[in-house]
Amino acid sequence: MLRDLFVKKKKYAAIPSEQVRKDVPDGVMTKCPKCKKIMYTKEVLKNLKVCVNCGYHHPMNAWERLDSILDEGSFREYDKEMVSLNPLEFPDYEEKLESDRKKTELNEAVVTGEGTIDDMLVVVAVMDSRFRMGSMGSVVGEKIARAVEKAYDLQVPFIIFTASGGARMQEGILSLMQMAKTSVALKKHSNAGGLFISVMTHPTTGGVSASFASLGDYNLAEPGALIGFAGRRVIEQTVREKLPEDFQTAEFLLEHGQLDAVVHRDDMRESLRKILEVHQGGEMAVWQS
């Protein structure tokens, strides 16, 4: 139109999106998925990967978790050399395993070993959701069972941090049988008076939640963790009802008696220390032959 000729247009400097991305190197900033606040990654790491604005607990890898709860330099790893094979010849499974090994620098989805918390010896297992979404295959189950047996032999408590999508479909029944294997090992440990502390982190689902994750003498969880067996949509379609908004969260499970406590990451080491201290010399520490 003619009037557009007499209207002074605003001038804008066009900045290519690629140029913007280059100005901020990858990994320098972290965006909270809950409150959407953008902050320096170093601040998030300094705060144990908890959002300083809303308290959202970002996922931790296995080594970060171990560093946050164990005495410095006390950890000794078990069964590091164990790796999964492809007994069912599932297509592309070996390639995916190798890709995850390179990406995570782990051989499997769980790290096991022994260490101390305030000089109290424990055997610990930490699942890492970066490796095949923390799914439980034959090696994951075997490493956890061996760790429990080591706790039995040493007559010390066993602690596990779970983060898993459930059983690993590429291993079929070999994966499902790990539910029984780990549960039997924990039963032996319990019958001997052994203490087992399970800490469920986001997410703990499927066969893991239906087996060893829920068998603790103390069942703890981090705030906001998703904990359940089947997915929300599957359950709603099955029962034909709308589920509560907070269904399958750690807080929901605590309210309904399925957890003993929801523990903030800042308080996790101290909470574990107190539990261990209470059971030193008590009934749970009386081992039977």
From Swiss-Prot:
Zn(2+) binds at residues 32, 35, 51, 54. It catalyses: N(6)-carboxybiotinyl-L-lysyl-[protein] + acetyl-CoA = N(6)-biotinyl-L-lysyl-[protein] + malonyl-CoA. GO terms for molecular function: acetyl-CoA carboxylase activity; ATP binding; carboxyl- or carbamoyltransferase activity; zinc ion binding. GO terms for cellular component: acetyl-CoA carboxylase complex. Keywords: ATP-binding, Cytoplasm, Fatty acid biosynthesis, Fatty acid metabolism, Lipid biosynthesis, Lipid metabolism, Metal-binding, Nucleotide-binding, Transferase, Zinc, Zinc-finger. Pathway: Lipid metabolism; malonyl-CoA biosynthesis; malonyl-CoA from acetyl-CoA: step 1/1. One of its GO terms (biological process) is malonyl-CoA biosynthetic process. Component of the acetyl coenzyme A carboxylase (ACC) complex. Biotin carboxylase (BC) catalyzes the carboxylation of biotin on its carrier protein (BCCP) and then the CO(2) group is transferred by the transcarboxylase to acetyl-CoA to form malonyl-CoA. Acetyl-CoA carboxylase is a heterohexamer composed of biotin carboxyl carrier protein (AccB), biotin carboxylase (AccC) and two subunits each of ACCase subunit alpha (AccA) and ACCase subunit beta (AccD). This is Acetyl-coenzyme A carboxylase carboxyl transferase subunit beta. It comes from Bacillus thuringiensis subsp. konkukian (strain 97-27). The lineage of its organism: Bacteria, Bacillati, Bacillota, Bacilli, Bacillales.
